């Protein structure tokens, strides 16, 4: 199941800001960036509806897999996992998270990706 709209991070200004100043946590198959939210970078309609959780985004480029089916499966897997991990944690409100998969991620088993995602979330102070 996809992330609800209230948990999604959208817009190139948000992504650029996360890439520039976000705190990085590196794993074998992904990089997690996290930073405090900056509502002024959000679109006006999103600013009016503050979220009770952090906002998340996934970047899965065509370098991970040339096949859109494979990239979409990875995206759905990680969206579902993030939703389960972060949805009911009010203490995480006010943070933005960006997860970028590395090209090697296509060779990893789904369980390995989820395990690494958990360890990166924990190292960023977002895990349980």
UniProtKB/Swiss-Prot annotation:
Keywords noted in UniProt: Endonuclease, Hydrolase, Nuclease, RNA-binding, tRNA processing
Keyword RNA-binding: yes
Signal peptide: none
Stored InterPro entries: Ribosomal_Su5_D2-typ_SF, Ribsml_uS5_D2-typ_fold_subgr, RNase_P
Any one GO CC term of the record: ribonuclease P complex
Enzyme Commission number, as recorded: 3.1.26.5
Catalytic reactions on record: Endonucleolytic cleavage of RNA, removing 5'-extranucleotides from tRNA precursor
Enzyme class label: hydrolase
Keyword RNA-binding: yes
Protein origin, superkingdom: Bacteria
Cited function: RNaseP catalyzes the removal of the 5'-leader sequence from pre-tRNA to produce the mature 5'-terminus. It can also cleave other RNA substrates such as 4.5S RNA. The protein component plays an auxiliary but essential role in vivo by binding to the 5'-leader sequence and broadening the substrate specificity of the ribozyme.
Oligomer and partners: Consists of a catalytic RNA component (M1 or rnpB) and a protein subunit.
Name of the featured protein: Ribonuclease P protein component
Organism expressing this protein natively: Parasynechococcus marenigrum (strain WH8102)
Gene that specifies this protein: rnpA
